[in-house]
């Protein structure tokens, strides 16, 4: 019979070798997984790079195309755009050959002068001023009341109301103080009134 101690040592050595082999096998499997993961990530990164490069190339080509189209060329789109801009500028210069000079002596003049600069606006001719009077008065009171309380402190609210109502009768925001026409006035008549109003303001405010 062999030595029991030696048999135990051999068994222990065999067990240790088996554990080492299992560990090596497990490590090899882990290494393989990591290797595959790295390769997969690398492929995804390369695909993203290629996609970004294609997008940059497409954007660059689009910008180059737009730039080429905007350049003046014989019979090209760019020349048509430039010609259109030039014709618009010429028309504007022909319509306004000389810039008039105006002056405002008070707040009403300043508001009228502002209306000249916006002569294309249609709010200067009002067919239904009565519809807008109440809302305009309310808006005026909201902005005016805090100022009036500072200017004339100690009054009752109805006194402030009376003062603001009287002020609004002459205020330019009052729809009845703007140019009004009846609801059935023709468009040609409205345009003639607008031109007459503009000419009147220009004559009064011209320096």
Swiss-Prot record:
Keywords assigned: Coiled coil, Cytoplasm, Nucleus
Gene Ontology molecular functions: transcription coactivator activity
Start and end residues of each stretch annotated as Disordered: 1-90
Pfam family, one: Ccdc124
Coiled-coil stretches: 5-71
An annotated GO BP: cellular response to oxidative stress
Subcellular location: Cytoplasm; Nucleus
Bias kind Basic and acidic residues: ranges: 9-28, 41-65
GO cellular component: cytoplasm; cytosol; nucleus
Location (main, coarse): cytoplasm
Top-level taxonomic group: Eukaryota
Functional note: Ribosome-binding protein involved in ribosome hibernation by associating with translationally inactive ribosomes. Required for translational recovery after starvation from stationary phase. May facilitate rapid translation reactivation by stabilizing the recycling-competent state of inactive ribosomes.
Similarity comment text for this entry: Belongs to the CCDC124 family.
Quaternary structure and partners: Associates with translationally inactive ribosomes in the nonrotated state.
Protein name per UniProt: Coiled-coil domain-containing protein 124 homolog
Organism of this sequence: Schizosaccharomyces pombe (strain 972 / ATCC 24843)
């Amino acid at each position: 019979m062999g030595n029991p101690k030696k048999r135990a040592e051999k068994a222990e050595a065999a067990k240790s070798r088996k554990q080492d082999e299992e560990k090596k096998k497990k490590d090899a499997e882990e290494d393989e997984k990591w290797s595959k993961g790295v390769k997969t990530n690398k492929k995804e990164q390369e695909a993203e790079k290629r996609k970004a490069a294609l997008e940059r190339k497409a954007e660059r080509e689009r910008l180059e195309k737009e730039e080429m189209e905007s350049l003046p060329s014989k019979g090209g789109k760019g020349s048509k755009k430039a010609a259109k801009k030039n014709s618009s500028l010429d028309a504007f210069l022909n319509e306004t050959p000389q810039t008039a000079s105006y002056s405002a002596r008070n707040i009403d003049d300043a508001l009228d002068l502002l209306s000249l600069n916006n002569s294309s606006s249609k709010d200067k001719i009002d067919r239904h001023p009565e519809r807008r009077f109440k809302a305009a008065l309310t808006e005026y009171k909201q902005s005016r009341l805090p100022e009036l309380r500072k200017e004339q402190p100690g009054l009752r609210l109805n006194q402030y109301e009376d003062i603001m109502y009287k002020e609004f009768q002459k205020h330019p925001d009052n729809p009845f103080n703007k140019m009004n026409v009846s609801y059935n006035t023709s468009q040609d008549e409205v345009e003639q009134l607008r031109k007459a109003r503009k000419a009147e303001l220009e004559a009064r405010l011209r320096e």
